[in-house]
Amino acid sequence: MLRMLLSYLKRLIYKESVAIKIKTPEQIEGIRLSSQLAAKTLKYIEPFVKPGVTTLELDTLIEKFVKDNGATSATKGYRGYKHASCISPNEVVCHGVPNQYVLKDGDILNIDVTTILNGYFGDTCKMYYVGIPSDYAKKLVETTKECLRLGMEECKPGAHLGDIGAAISEHAHANGYSVVYEFCGHGVGLKFHEEPDVQHIAKRGTGPVLKQGMIFTIEPMINAGKARCKIDRRDGWTARTIDDKLSAQFEHTILITEDGFEALTDVYGDF
C-alpha cells in the first residue's frame, strides 16, 4: 500500500527538466496525416461493433483497413504484442488483447489504434456502446468524454502540463469517479512513445511549460470504482479495474499551436 501511495504522489508533481521535442512543420504534417488515418479507422469499425461479434474479429478488420490505406499498426510486434489494436470491454481499463470475447447488448467498449503512415505515428481511442447501454454506463462514458475535452482546453503555449491532469481529475472526482494513475498519455509522432508523460491527475502549475510544436496524447481512463488496476497474468497486457467495475477512456493526439491547440485525431468532431 505504501508503494502504491508513493507512486500516486509522484504523479502529482512533474519533473521540470523533461526534454520534449518540438516538431518541425514537415513533421507536423506527417503526424497529422497519420492521426487522421487513425481517426478514420475508428470511424470505419463503428458499424461492426454490435452484439455477436468477437473482439478478435474487430481487430482483423482494423488491421486490414490500416494496411489497405498504406499504413501499419504500431501495436503489432510492440514488445511482443500480436494485434493491430487494443480492445477493452467493460471493466478493462486499457491494453485489452483481442480474443474470442463475444460482444453482448449493454457492453461498453474502447478501441485504441495507433497508425504508422510514412514513418509518422497517430494515436487515438474512443468508446462504443454495444446495443443499448445502461444509464450507469452511459454517465461514466459521457463524463470521461468531458474529462478529455476539459483537459484539451488547458492546452496552449505558456500553460503547464500539470494543468491538464488537474482539469481532468477535478471533473472526474466531482462526478464521483476515480482517475487511473498507473497509465498516462505520452509524447508521440516520431516514435510510438516519447517524452513527456501526460498524467491525468496532477497539480496545476506543475510540469514543463507547453510550447508551440509539442505533440502528445491526452487519454484519461476514468473508473466507476477504485482507481487501481490489475494486469491479467495470462496475457501480460490486459489491465482491469481492481474491483471489476466499469472503466472508460477517450484519447486524442494534441498539437500545441501558436495560440492554443489542434486535436490532430479529431476528424469527425464526435468527441
What are these regions (language model features)?
Residues 2-271:
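Active-site neighborhoods and metal-handling regions in enzymes and metal-associated proteins
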